[in-house]
Amino acid sequence: MNDLITKHPMDGVRFTKPVRATDDIKFLTRDEQRVFLKTAKRSRNYNQYALILETGLRTGEMIGLTWDAIDFQNRTLTVNKTLEYRHKQHFWRAGPPKTQQSYRTIPLTDRAYEILKGIWDSRPEQKESPTLAKTLEYIDRRTGVSSRLVMRDLVFINWRTGEPAKN
């Protein structure tokens, strides 16, 4: 033998994502959720925690939530965008969800409806201002089309109080 490899040993091998075993998926039981929310009641972020537990939203989906995605009449919430922080570039980026399966319409439970309706009813009248007129622009990764997200449509949460930011 001359110790030469004539063919790459990985030729013909397909790389696939590892399949996650169902017992590897971590979730809170109903009792754990109840204890968590009882403890979180004192938190400024209680509404966010409760909404995530009620709807199954990911964090980026929740902070990218806009009022036009909420249908109070039909009691649904549509996930069609996310908001994520780009640490290296030091800015927030609004964009589409990461996968096609992430686009979805979620029926609101009575509790989720109460949370969102409470936030909607407690917000001050929107006033036009230069700040509210600013837009976030992003490029849709799938289509390459430049899109615009209007700031006044975003629901920003004041992390100190846990309530919607007042503009």
Residue ranges and their predicted role:
Residues 25, 69, 95-98, 145-146:
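Short secondary-structure boundary/capping segments
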Residues 46-49, 73, 79, 87-89, ...:
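Extended hydrophobic-aromatic, low-complexity segments
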Residues 76-78, 94-118, 136-141, 149-167:
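C-terminal catalytic core of Y-nucleophile DNA break-rejoin enzymes
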Residues 1-11, 72-75, 81, 85-88, ...:
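Proline-centered turn/helix-capping motifs that create local helix->coil transitions or kinks
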Residues 16, 80-82, 159:
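Small disulfide-bonded, cysteine-rich extracellular recognition modules and tandem repeats
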Residues 5-65, 72-73, 84, 101-103, ...:
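Basic, Lys/Arg- and aromatic-enriched nucleic-acid-binding interface segment
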Residues 35-36, 88-93:
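DNA/chromatin major-groove-contacting recognition/catalytic segments
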